[in-house]
């Protein structure tokens, strides 16, 4: 929706649901990340993700075959999307919308690093932001 309505990419689509997408903003990864774990670097000091994790890097787990198409990065950044998290090889792993209380997207799945006694901080932050929004 961001690509279509803010970036004006009327044909923006996800290759998982449309393998012939004209504007594949989410495209098939060259290597599947299903079951993978990697260190994700958080670059944007002051971003929500940086505040939530209070770290320059985190250990992240995945269950995906598709990811952000890097060829759209410049356009998204020009439209106030902050690319906040990257893999060690520079692939985008997380983003957030500037000036929004909690518009965050990640390629990794915070639920996969959560345990009964330790819920991933990004999930807790989302719950807290939701509660604040209801007030």
In which residue ranges do the predicted regions lie?
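Phosphate-binding active sites in nucleotide-utilizing proteins
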Residues: 1
């Amino acid at each position: 929706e961001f690509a279509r309505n803010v970036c004006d990419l009327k044909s923006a689509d996800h290759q998982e649901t449309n393998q012939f997408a004209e504007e594949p903003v989410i495209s098939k990864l060259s290597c599947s990340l299903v079951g993978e774990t990697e260190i994700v670097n958080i670059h944007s000091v002051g971003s929500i993700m940086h505040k939530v994790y209070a770290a320059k890097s985190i250990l992240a787990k995945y269950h995906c075959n598709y990811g952000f198409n890097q060829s759209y990065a410049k356009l998204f950044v020009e439209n106030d999307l902050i690319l906040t998290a990257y893999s060690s090889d520079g692939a985008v792993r997380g983003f957030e919308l500037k000036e929004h209380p909690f518009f965050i997207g990640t390629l990794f799945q915070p639920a996969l690093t959560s345990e009964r006694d330790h819920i991933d901080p990004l999930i807790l932050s989302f719950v807290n932001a939701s509660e604040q929004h209801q007030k």
